[in-house]
UniProtKB/Swiss-Prot annotation:
Signal peptide positions (record): none
Keywords of this entry: Allosteric enzyme, Glycosyltransferase, GTP-binding, Magnesium, Nucleotide-binding, Transferase
Phylogenetic classification of the source organism: Bacteria, Bacillati, Bacillota, Clostridia, Eubacteriales
Entries under InterPro entries matching the protein: PRibTrfase_dom (IPR000836), PRTase-like (IPR029057), Upp_B (IPR034332), UPRTase/APRTase (IPR050054), Ura_phspho_trans (IPR005765)
Entry note: cofactor: Binds 1 Mg(2+) ion per subunit. The magnesium is bound as Mg-PRPP.
UniProt-recorded name of the protein: Uracil phosphoribosyltransferase
Annotated organism of origin: Clostridium beijerinckii (strain ATCC 51743 / NCIMB 8052)
Catalytic reactions of this protein: UMP + diphosphate = 5-phospho-alpha-D-ribose 1-diphosphate + uracil
Annotated Gene3D superfamilies: 3.40.50.2020
Binding residues for 5-phospho-alpha-D-ribose 1-diphosphate: 79, 104, 131-139, 200
Amino acid sequence: MSKVIEINHPLILHKLAILRDEKTGSKDFRKLVEEISMLMAYEVTRDLNTEEVEVKTPVAVTKCKMLSGKKMAVVPILRAGLGMVDGVLNLIPAAKVGHIGLYRDEKTLQPVEYFCKMPQDIAERDIIVVDPMLATGGSAIDALTMLKNRGAKNLKLMCLVGAPEGIEAIKKAHDDVDIYLASIDEKLNEHGYIVPGLGDAGDRLFGTK
């Protein structure tokens, strides 16, 4: 059963408040998304495996812990997910980066993949899928399905803000994927926007409309 983890660290809450403000421009918005993503990644990676190693310091030989087990990958959902990548890489610089681009066919409402580029060994990696907004959950569900179809098994979803509707949709479709959020917001409005949300994260990141 998937877990839903709301990371309410004071630094995240402070930065998220500035991020939400409609007066925050694209330059500051990008920086805040990166900073919050790095802080969240600390919690998302809390359960990574470690092994004991011997290290010689300038003073003595000692036992230390280092990461062991699977390599990692971060996979942004285009385009807004790109804003979260550097924050994760600041903490996990050795992680590989894959990209997933999706849109929905207006007639069939089915997901259409327009771009997908993954590390060759993606099936063997622990994967963090990143997207600032978890609204209906449709894009995240499709992205997780695509990764599973490529053999991925250990997946986590990291979003800045999410609506209860999207969270429930993910839990129903992918009950083996844990969901990490900086905030669980109130609801979706009639246009499918998260309330209070951030507005359109992609437009605010890249200065487009």
